[in-house]
């Protein structure tokens, strides 16, 4: 089992998830959502190819849904590198700055 490595933007993404969910559903639901996302990180370390291949957006990119959020990651050998946590209701290509 590889390590989970978080890139710098992930911390801000998790803060945004908490803030957005908290505004609409309260602290308890927001905390539960963060716990779900964190559990996905550990699951991906055990099963790194579990997510969907999204090389159409960026070479090597994979995504895993924690509705409505998308965990974007790539593999680096045995390690899982978490790149971003983005809103899956929005166009991922646009959020990544890719023209469609």
Swiss-Prot record:
Keywords: Toxin-antitoxin system. Disruption phenotype: No visible phenotype when deleted singly or as the parDE3 operon. InterPro entries: RelE/ParE_toxin, RelE/ParE_toxin_dom_sf. This is Toxin ParE3. Belongs to the RelE toxin family. Toxic component of a type II toxin-antitoxin (TA) system. Its toxic effect is neutralized by coexpression with cognate antitoxin ParD3 but no other ParD or RelB antitoxin. The gene is parE3.
